[in-house]
C-alpha cells in the first residue's frame, strides 16, 4: 500500500475591501495534516452516472470523472454507441462496460493512461497515431462535472434548457467557505438576503428569495436548519429560474443543492488542524477528521466526518462554537446502492443584526465596524439533526429507480436585542430585550422516481417521473418582549447594564407555519435528431398551508389548493462542446403570513391566489472536456399575485394584484485555463423592480444589486523543492449598490471582498502533509 494525504485548503479573510499578499505572513494559515491510504489506479473507486451516448462522448465523460486519459486512433470509436454506466466502480470496470459490444478492448500504459485496441478477432482495426482525450488529473480541477444531481436525472447539462451552476469540490477545498453565502459568491446573480442576525442561510437568486423559503436542499431534499454548509459538503449546485417542476413550491429565483461527501470503498483518512486570528487577541482554533473506506469485502463502505470550531467573533465581543458529527454507511451491490447518513450539529453563534441607518444621512451610522449595538448575551444556541436515506436500483440498462427520505430538525434558543428608535441629537438608542425560546423547525420529505429511456417513432425519449411528499413546520414557542432598563449610547457604548429578557408575550408566542404538500411530476426530453432536443413536462401539486400565532392561537393563514405547473424548452447541440437553448418555466408559492396583516383582519385562505411566476430564458453552454465550462443566459421573470394592500376607508383590503419583474444577463466560467492555471468567475446584471402596486410601482426590489461579479484564480507551481508542491490563489467579489428597503429611501453601499490562499505539500516521515 502506498500512503498519501488528500489536499486541504487555506483561506484567510483579511478585509472587506482589500487584501495584500504580505499580510499572509502575519496571519496564521490553516494547517492541514492528512494521511490517506490508497490502492492503485486500477483499484480506485469512482462514482459514475454516464448516460448512453456516442462512444467518443462517453470516453470524454469517463476521463472527466476519473482524471485518466484514453488514447485511440482517430477512427476507432466513431460510429459506436456506449451503454449507460452507473454506480461506484473502478476506472477499468467502467471502461470495460463502456466498450461492451464495440469490438474494442484496452490496456493500461501507465497510472493515468488507458489505450484502446481492437479485440483479437479477424478484421480487427490496427491502432495508428493516438489522440489524447484528457491529460489532467481531475482531483485539482475547477471544471464542474458534466451532470448535476440538482436536475434529478443523469442527463448531460449540455442537454438542459436552463442555467445550472456548479461550484466544484476543489473550489470548496481551496476557498474553505465558512457558510453557504461564501460559497455562492462564485455564482452569478446571487446576493445575500436577510440572514436574521447571521444565523440563517438566505439566498436571493435573480432577485428572488429569503431565509426559510424552502429553496435550500441537501442531496436533492429540503432542509430547515439555519446553516447548511459544513465539513460534510463536497460541492454546491444551483438551478436558476423557476424550479417548481422538479421541486414544487418555490420562489422563481431557483434552488441551491449541497451535495454531501459519500462513503467510498477506497480507504481515505485525513486530519485537518486549523488556527486563525483577527488580531487584538481574537483567536480561534478547530479541526476536522474525515475517514472513509470499505467494511470487509461485502460492498459495505463507511464515512465519518467530525468537525469542531471554537473562535472569537470578529467584532468587539462574541463567540462562535460548533461541533459536527456525521457518520454514513453505504452498500454497493451489482445493481443496487443503499445509503444512510446522519448528521448532528450543536452550535453557539452571535445573533448580530449589524449596524443601523442614520436617518439624517440615509447611510450606516458613523461608528467603528467592530462596534455592536446589542449585548454580550445576544446569542443563538441550539442543535440540528439530519437523517437521510437513499436507495437506487438499476432495473436494466435503460431504467433505474430512486427512493429518498429525509428528516431534518433544528431547535434553538436566542436572545435578540433590537433597536427600536434612535436619537441622533443625543447619540443614543432605545432597545428592546427580545428573544425566542423553544424554537423547533422540522421537515420530512419522501420521494420516489423512475428514470429511463424509450424509442418512439425513431426518436429517443429520456423520461423522469415521480412523486413527492413533504411536511414542514416552523414553530417558535415563547417570544420574549421586554423593555430595556436604560438608553444606549452608540457614541460611547457601555455594555452590561441590561439583563437578558425573560418576559413572554402571549400575543406573539406559539408562532406556527405549517405546510403539507403532495405532488406528481413528469419530464420528457425528446431527441428529435442528433442535434435538437425538446424538453417538456409538468407537476401537479396539492398543498395545505396553515399559519398564525398567539396564546390563544389565531390563524392568519388557512389555505389549500391545487396547482399545475408546466415547463418547456428546446436545446440545439451545435457541437458536442457547444449548445444553445431556450426555455419557458413556471413556479408558484402560496401567499401566507404568520402575523395578522397590517390594518386588516383578513385570513389568507383559498380565495387568495398563490404567487405565480413565469420565466423566459435564452442561453448558451460551452463544455470543453478537461478545460473549461461556461454559461451565458438572458432571462426575464415576472411574478404576479403578490399581496397588495388597498385602503378603503378605515379598512385595509388585501388582494393578490401586485406584480414584480426581474430581467438580466448572467455569465459564468469555470475550469482549467492551462495545466497550471485554474479559475472560476461570474458576472450578473439584474434589473428588478415592482411593476404593479399602488404604492411601490417603479421601485427597485429590496437588496438586489444591478451589478455583481467575482473572479478567483489559482496557479499550481507543481514540484518545487525536493518534489514538494506549491499552489497559490487569490480572488475578489463585488456586489453593487442595492435598495435598502421596499420604499427605496436609502441604499446599501457597494462592496468588494478580496481573498487569498496558499498551500504547500511536503512529506513528514512518509506521510503527506499540507500547510
Across the structure, where does each feature detected by a protein language model lie?
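Acidic, small-polar-rich N-terminal luminal/periplasmic segments of exported/outer-membrane proteins
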Residues: 64, 69, 86, 128-266, ...
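N-terminal export/assembly leaders
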Residues: 29-124
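Membrane-embedded beta-barrel scaffold of Gram-negative outer-membrane proteins
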Residues: 390-406, 410-418, 580-581, 609-672, ...
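Gram-negative outer-membrane beta-barrel transporters
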Residues: 529-531, 636-638, 655-741
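Acidic/polar loop-and-plug regions of large Gram-negative outer-membrane beta-barrel proteins
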Residues: 309-313, 326-394, 407-441, 484-513, ...
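Face-selective signature of the C-terminal outer-membrane beta-barrel domain
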Residues: 387-410, 433-548
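Outer-membrane beta-barrel translocator/receptor signature
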Residues: 232-234, 245-327, 331-337, 385, ...
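Structural signature of Gram-negative outer-membrane beta-barrels, strongest in the C-terminal barrel
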Residues: 326, 330-332, 441, 460-472, ...
Amino acid at each position: 500500500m502506498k500512503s498519501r494525504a488528500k489536499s486541504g485548503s487555506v483561506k484567510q479573510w483579511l478585509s472587506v475591501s482589500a487584501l495584500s499578499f504580505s499580510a499572509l505572513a502575519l496571519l496564521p494559515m490553516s494547517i492541514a495534516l492528512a494521511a490517506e491510504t490508497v490502492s492503485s489506479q486500477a483499484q480506485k473507486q469512482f462514482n459514475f452516472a454516464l448516460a448512453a451516448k456516442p462512444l467518443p462522448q462517453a470516453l470524454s465523460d469517463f476521463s472527466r470523472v476519473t482524471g485518466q486519459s484514453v488514447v485511440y486512433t482517430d477512427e476507432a470509436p466513431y460510429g459506436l454507441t456506449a451503454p449507460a454506466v452507473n454506480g461506484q466502480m473502478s476506472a477499468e470496470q467502467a471502461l470495460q462496460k463502456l466498450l461492451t459490444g464495440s469490438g474494442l478492448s484496452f490496456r493500461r500504459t501507465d497510472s493515468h493512461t488507458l489505450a484502446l485496441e481492437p479485440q483479437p478477432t479477424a478484421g480487427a482495426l490496427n491502432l495508428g497515431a493516438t489522440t489524447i482525450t484528457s491529460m489532467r488529473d481531475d482531483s485539482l480541477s475547477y471544471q464542474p462535472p458534466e451532470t448535476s444531481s440538482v436536475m434529478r436525472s443523469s442527463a448531460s447539462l449540455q442537454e438542459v434548457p436552463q442555467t445550472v451552476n456548479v461550484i466544484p469540490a476543489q473550489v470548496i477545498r481551496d476557498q474553505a467557505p465558512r457558510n453557504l453565502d461564501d460559497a455562492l459568491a462564485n455564482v452569478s446573480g446571487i446576493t445575500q438576503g436577510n440572514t436574521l442576525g447571521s444565523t440563517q442561510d438566505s439566498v436571493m437568486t435573480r432577485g428572488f428569495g429569503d431565509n426559510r423559503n424552502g429553496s435550500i436542499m441537501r442531496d436533492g431534499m429540503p432542509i430547515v436548519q439555519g446553516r447548511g454548509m459544513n465539513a460534510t459538503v463536497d460541492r454546491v449546485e444551483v438551478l436558476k429560474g423557476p424550479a417548481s417542476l422538479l421541486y414544487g413550491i418555490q420562489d422563481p429565483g431557483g434552488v441551491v443543492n449541497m451535495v454531501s461527501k459519500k462513503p467510498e470503498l477506497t480507504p481515505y483518512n485525513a486530519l485537518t488542524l486549523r488556527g486563525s486570528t483577527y488580531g487584538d487577541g481574537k483567536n480561534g482554533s478547530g479541526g476536522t477528521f474525515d475517514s472513509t473506506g470499505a467494511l470487509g469485502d461485502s460492498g459495505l463502505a463507511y464515512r465519518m466526518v467530525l468537525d469542531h470550531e471554537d473562535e472569537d467573533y470578529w467584532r468587539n465581543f462574541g463567540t462562535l462554537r460548533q461541533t459536527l458529527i456525521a457518520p454514513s454507511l453505504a452498500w454497493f451491490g451489482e445493481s443496487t446502492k443503499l445509503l444512510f447518513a446522519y448528521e448532528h450539529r450543536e452550535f453557539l453563534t452571535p445573533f448580530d443584526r449589524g449596524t443601523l441607518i442614520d436617518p439624517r444621512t440615509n447611510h450606516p451610522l458613523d461608528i467603528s465596524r467592530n462596534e455592536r449595538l446589542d449585548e454580550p448575551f445576544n446569542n443563538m444556541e441550539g442543535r440540528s439533526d439530519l437523517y437521510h436515506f437513499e436507495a437506487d436500483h438499476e432495473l436494466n440498462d435503460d431504467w433505474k429507480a430512486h427512493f429518498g427520505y429525509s428528516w431534518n430538525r433544528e431547535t434553538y434558543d436566542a436572545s435578540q436585542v433590537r433597536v427600536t428608535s434612535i436619537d441622533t441629537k443625543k447619540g443614543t438608542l432605545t432597545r428592546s430585550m427580545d428573544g425566542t425560546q423553544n424554537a423547533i423547525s422540522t421537515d420530512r420529505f419522501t420521494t420516489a422516481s423512475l428514470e429511463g429511456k424509450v424509442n418512439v417513432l425513431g426518436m429517443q425519449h429520456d423520461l423522469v417521473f415521480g412523486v413527492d411528499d413533504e411536511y414542514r413546520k416552523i414553530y417558535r414557542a415563547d417570544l420574549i418582549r421586554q423593555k430595556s432598563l436604560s438608553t444606549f449610547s452608540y457614541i460611547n457604548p457601555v455594555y452590561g447594564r441590561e439583563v437578558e429578557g425573560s418576559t413572554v408575550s402571549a400575543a406573539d408566542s406559539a408562532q406556527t407555519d405549517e405546510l403539507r404538500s403532495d405532488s406528481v411530476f413528469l419530464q420528457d426530453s425528446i431527441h428529435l435528431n442528433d442535434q435538437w432536443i425538446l424538453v417538456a413536462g409538468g407537476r401537479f401539486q396539492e398543498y395545505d398551508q396553515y399559519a398564525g400565532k398567539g396564546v390563544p392561537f389565531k390563524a392568519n393563514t388557512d389555505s389549500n389548493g391545487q396547482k399545475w405547473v408546466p415547463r418547456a424548452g428546446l436545446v440545439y447541440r451545435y457541437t458536442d462542446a457547444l449548445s444553445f437553448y431556450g426555455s419557458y418555466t413556471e413556479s408558484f408559492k402560496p401567499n401566507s403570513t404568520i402575523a395578522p396583516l397590517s390594518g386588516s383582519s383578513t385570513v389568507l385562505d383559498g380565495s387568495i391566489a398563490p404567487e405565480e411566476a413565469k420565466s423566459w430564458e435564452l442561453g448558451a453552454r460551452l463544455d470543453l472536456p478537461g478545460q473549461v465550462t461556461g454559461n451565458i443566459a438572458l432571462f426575464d421573470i415576472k411574478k404576479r399575485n403578490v399581496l397588495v394592500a388597498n385602503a378603503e376607508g378605515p379598512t385595509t383590503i388585501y388582494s393578490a394584484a401586485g406584480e414584480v419583474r426581474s430581467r438580466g444577463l448572467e455569465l459564468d466560467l469555470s475550469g482549467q485555463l492551462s495545466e497550471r492555471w485554474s479559475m472560476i468567475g461570474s458576472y450578473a446584471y439584474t434589473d428588478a423592480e415592482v411593476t404593479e402596486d399602488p404604492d411601490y410601482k417603479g421601485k427597485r426590489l429590496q437588496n438586489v444589486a444591478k451589478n455583481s461579479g467575482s473572479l478567483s484564480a489559482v496557479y499550481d507551481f507543481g514540484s518545487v523543492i525536493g518534489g514538494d508542491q506549491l499552489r497559490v490563489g487569490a480572488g475578489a467579489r463585488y456586489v453593487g449598490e442595492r435598495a435598502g428597503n421596499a420604499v427605496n429611501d436609502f441604499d446599501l453601499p457597494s462592496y468588494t471582498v478580496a481573498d487569498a490562499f496558499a498551500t504547500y505539500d511536503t512529506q513528514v516521515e512518509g506521510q503527506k502533509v499540507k500547510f
